[in-house]
Structure formats: C-alpha cells, structure tokens
UniProtKB/Swiss-Prot annotation:
<comment type="similarity">
    <text>Belongs to the AB hydrolase superfamily.</text>
</comment>
<dbReference type="InterPro" id="IPR013094">
    <property type="entry name" value="AB_hydrolase_3"/>
</dbReference>
<dbReference type="GO" id="GO:0016787">
    <property type="term" value="F:hydrolase activity"/>
</dbReference>
<dbReference type="GO" id="GO:0016042">
    <property type="term" value="P:lipid catabolic process"/>
</dbReference>
<dbReference type="InterPro" id="IPR029058">
    <property type="entry name" value="AB_hydrolase_fold"/>
</dbReference>
<protein>
    <recommendedName>
        <fullName>AB hydrolase superfamily protein B1A11.02</fullName>
        <ecNumber>3.-.-.-</ecNumber>
    </recommendedName>
</protein>
<keyword id="KW-0378">Hydrolase</keyword>
<dbReference type="Pfam" id="PF07859">
    <property type="entry name" value="Abhydrolase_3"/>
</dbReference>
<dbReference type="InterPro" id="IPR050300">
    <property type="entry name" value="GDXG_lipolytic_enzyme"/>
</dbReference>
C-alpha cells in the first residue's frame, strides 16, 4: 500500500474553545470499558443537543413511517417534506445516523434536515436501524440495504422526483452505510441511480482486519487515545459488540472488492481529533484516484461528531454552513432537465 500523506499536525491541535470546556468538564472517554457505560455517557451528551435542536419550519412537514426489512421487522423512518415545493421539483436524500452500530442517534441530525428541506426543496428520509449488542452483524447493514432499496422503489410515493437528485448521506456508522450502499447500487444497477453521496466522519475500516504495515499508516488511531467522544479503545468496544465477519467488505468499504470506479460525486466532512479521520481522508483519495469527483473538509482540533456532542462550540455554525455549501455542490452535479 502506498504511503498515505494526509496527517497534519494542525488536525489534532485542540480547538481553543474545546480546550476550555474540557478543563471544566473532562471527556471521560478513558474510563469507558463497556458498551453500557458508553450508552450512558452518550445519553447525557444528547441532553445538551436536545436544547439546540431547531424548531420545525412552517413549510416543512414531518411524517413517521415504517419500512419493511427482509426478516419481517419494520424499522422507523422519518420523512421531512418541503410542503411549499411541488413534488416534481423535489430531490430526495436518504440519511443514516451515527451509532457505532450500538447507540441510539436517529434524531441527532433533525436540525440539519430542518435546514436542508426548505432551503433546497429536498425530501429528507432519516432511517433508523437495529443496534448491537441486541442485534449483531449483519443486521444493521441488512436494515440499511433493505431500507435504501425500499426508498429507491418508493421515491414518487414519498413525494420526490429522482431526476432532481437522489442522494445518500450518513454519519459515522451511517457514513459506512453510504459507502457500502453506493457500491451495491452501482454493482446491482439499482434504479433510480444515485446522484450524490455525503460522508460525515465515516467508519471505513476494521483495524483488526488490516496488517500492521497498513494499519500503521492510519496515524489517527495513535493520535486520538485521549480524544473526547470516541477513542480507538471505544471503537474496539463497538466492533466487539457488533461482531462483524472478519474481512467483510461491509465494514471495510475502503477496500471494496469491486473497486471505486463510477461512483457519484462525494462530499466529505471529517474531524481532526477523531480516530476515523485518516480512513475518511484515505477514502476520499481513493475515490478521486478512481476518477470520481470529491470535496473534502477537515475540522481541525475537534472530535468525532463534535456538532452533536459539543453543540456549544462556535465551529458548529461553520459545520452547518459547510453542509449547505456541500449540498449545493452535490446538487450542481445533477443533470438538469427542462422545467
């Protein structure tokens, strides 16, 4: 494997605002030894997020739906619809939340949808999935595959026109689904075709599946031992609870066996103080090398999903501004049809 030249000292230089917060409120990640502790800490953090969730705009409706899966289970979905935009002019994005495949997070990105839906006339479908350790590999991936195919088959019923844009987005474990599903959609020739991908802090490798020489190139795993939110040790806890099949491309999409050619344009948002930083950057490089269009932003000195866990940071405003710019960029690649 060629040397990956993507480590920058600025990435892990702690954001000044965050440094002051951590002096008063230490992250506590070093004390996490099991998934139950992680879930408890996660719930406490989300109480802060709940106070910052934007109100629902007047021109956006929200509908809760149930999506069927292969084993007969129905999983939750929430549809954000721009009611003032005619259905024929609406694009659609399917979005998968962060979780480490183990933690609840389906409402984490509601504020994002409340911004994108009215601004861009985009129907946003936020999809849940079953979690480990209660449901082990490959249940979460199967839920993602089944829900994506269901949405693809029901876009018009969901009030959107795929010719205006059909997008996949996700954060962390949800970002993993974005990569996996885009390859499946390409290889299986799923219609309508995807027009854009949005990768937020994606998990794209299983360290245990890589040889030492390759793993050594992902320096972010060494540089984030004391990071807030997630550390390499916490990533180990997630994998131990989800128990993926060794070498599965579903958890190692960076090395997807059918390669990365002919994928839609990809927008990346990665965090500098995050174990997953380097795999996100490496994946962006791999997509670009395969001839795909990409755009990458790295937020220096902040941890994984900082906009969820540290919503008081002023950098969160930039995250939303970048999200708007990034989605505008994805929309710009959609082939225009006559109005």
């Amino acid at each position: 494997m060629a040397e990956l030249e993507f480590t920058d000292e600025k990435f892990t230089k702690v954001d000044p605002e965050l440094k002051e917060i951590l002096k008063k409120h230490p992250a506590g990640t070093e004390n996490i030894t099991n998934i139950w502790q992680m879930r408890a800490m996660d719930e406490e953090c989300r109480k802060q997020l709940a106070e910052t969730i934007l109100p629902l705009p007047d021109d956006v409706s929200v509908t809760d739906i149930l999506i069927p899966t292969r084993d007969g289970t129905e999983i939750d979905g929430r549809v954000f619809t721009p009611v003032s935009v005619p259905a024929d002019y609406r694009s659609l994005m399917v979005f998968y939340h962060s979780s480490g495949w183990c933690m609840r997070g389906v409402r984490d990105d509601d504020s994002l949808f409340k911004i994108l839906t009215p601004k861009f006339g985009c129907v946003c479908v936020s999809v849940d999935y079953r979690l480990a350790p209660e449901s082990k590999f490959p249940v979460a991936h199967n839920d993602a595959i089944d829900s994506f195919k269901w949405v693809a088959s029901n876009i018009e019923k969901l009030g959107a026109n795929p010719k205006r844009g059909f997008f996949l987005g996700g954060a962390s474990a949800g970002g993993n689904f974005v990569s996996v599903l885009s390859h499946i959609a390409r290889d299986e020739k799923i219609k309508p075709e995807l027009t854009g991908l949005w990768h937020m802090v994606p998990t794209l490798i299983h360290p245990a599946d890589l040889d030492e020489e390759t793993m050594a190139q992902f320096r972010s795993y060494k540089e984030t031992i004391h990071a807030p939110v997630i550390t390499p040790k916490i990533m180990d806890i997630f994998f131990e609870n989800y128990q993926p099949t060794p070498k599965s491309p579903l958890v190692n999409p960076l090395y997807y066996p059918t390669g990365h050619k002919d994928l839609p344009p990809s927008f990346f948002q990665c965090c500098g103080w995050d174990p997953l930083r380097d795999e996100g950057i490496a994946y962006e490089k791999a997509l670009k090398a395969a001839g795909n269009e990409t755009r990458l932003i790295v937020y220096e000195g902040v941890p994984h999903c900082f906009w969820v866990y540290y919503p008081m940071l002023s950098l969160r405003k930039k995250y939303f501004e970048d999200a708007i710019d990034g989605f505008t960029w994805l929309l710009s690649h959609v082939k225009k049809e006559d109005d």
